[in-house]
Amino acid sequence: MDKKNRKPHQLIDDIYSIGCWITGSKEDAAELIEKTYLIIDPEATEIDVFKTFRHCLLDSLKGISCIPKPSCNDMEKLGYKLIKQDAEMKLTVLLAEISGLSPEIISKIMGNSVKEVNYWLSTGRTRFSSDLLLLNGRSKKSR
């Protein structure tokens, strides 16, 4: 299928795959798809669909913190910012790898400069490969 000018219904598989990778859960990915498609216009552009998906993803992270029982509000905000940054980096890489989007288009979706998107792509790909190597190492040890 041509990856240019896709309609919203043609993006469901990409969004589901991205949602699974980011959340680690098929149920959470399906919920993100449902929320995204309840908001978008059936004739929305590809960029608008992915922007809406990003909004739904970040909205689902609100209230989550990587710092257990933060002792102050600032620590809770820091924890959320770390989780959000991690999700943004993963989303950037997955938009490029799964959907085949260019850094220019990703920058429009993410609201960042192309330079920042390229940095996140480089850093994020390195992190993904390191994480996968760690997971493969653990699974081989458990055999």
Please provide the spans of the model-predicted regions.
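Arg/Lys-rich amphipathic alpha helix in sigma70-family domain 2
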Residues: E46-C72
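Short amphipathic alpha helix immediately N-terminal
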Residues: K84-I105, I109
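DNA-recognition helix of helix-turn-helix
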Residues: M110-R143
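Hydrophobic recognition helices of helix-based DNA-binding modules
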Residues: I40, L57-S65, F128, L132
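Short amphipathic alpha-helical boundary/capping segments
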Residues: P68, E76-D86, K108
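A short, charge-rich alpha-helical start-of-domain segment used by transcription regulators
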Residues: M1-S17, D41, T45-E46, K90
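Conserved RNAP core-binding helix
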Residues: K26-E43
